[in-house]
Amino acid sequence: QVAQTLGLDRDHAINLGLPGLMSADLVELVKTGKMSEMNTLSGCQYDYPEIVEYLKEADIISIQMGSNDAFVPTVVAIGNATNWKSEDLASIVLSGNLRSKDPETRAAFQASMKKLKLTKSETDAVWNLVTSGMNKICTDAYPVSTANIRSVVETVRALNPDAQILLIGATNPVPLLPSWSNYFNKLNKFQKQLAEVYDIDYVAVPYAQ
């Protein structure tokens, strides 16, 4: 929808989205074209020297980041809590099927939990994560994400002073969790304000208020 509004098509676009990339990783990539070391949480390490030249030559650059700073640590925490029985739960989160707050969404989450066949201690660990652990994850992620978003915007603007920069709202995959809703609401508010400061365009998307 964003591309259609701007009159763009995929034939003239390069998708530089990389799976598992967290905001600190993107800071390195836009500055040097590579990550200095593996991200131990996501397991990714990218060496992509072309990215800097692509950014220098682009007419329009869209940036969407911040979601993985909360999402990746949460997936790892769920894995640790369930002794890595959590593939079904991770899959349903990744699918986006938990983006609604309706009863069907809650039922899907509960059904996914049942499939895990967790022990009592594992179940307790998961619910502790949901009720308090995720709040810490999101609280820790916010200052990191905001600092890195600012750094990426500044770096991209320095590389290409003339490009139109679109700062795309971060999407919340699980809005039924209060800690996540708070994180993404704050993150997108920050991005809107940042866009005004740097005279770039903020683009809201569904589940990115």
List each language-model region with its residue ranges.
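Short, conserved clusters of charged catalytic residues that mark active-site
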Residues: 46, 151, 186
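Substrate-gating cap/lid alpha-helix
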Residues: 143, 168, 172-207
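A structural motif corresponding to the C-terminal end of an alpha-helix
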Residues: 6-8, 148-167, 190-203
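Structural beta-sheet core signal
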Residues: 63, 167-168
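Conserved SGNH/GDSL esterase-like catalytic core that processes O-acyl groups on lipids
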Residues: 2-143, 147
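Acidic carboxylate-rich catalytic motifs and surrounding loops in phosphoryl-/glycosyl-chemistry enzymes
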Residues: 14-20, 201-209
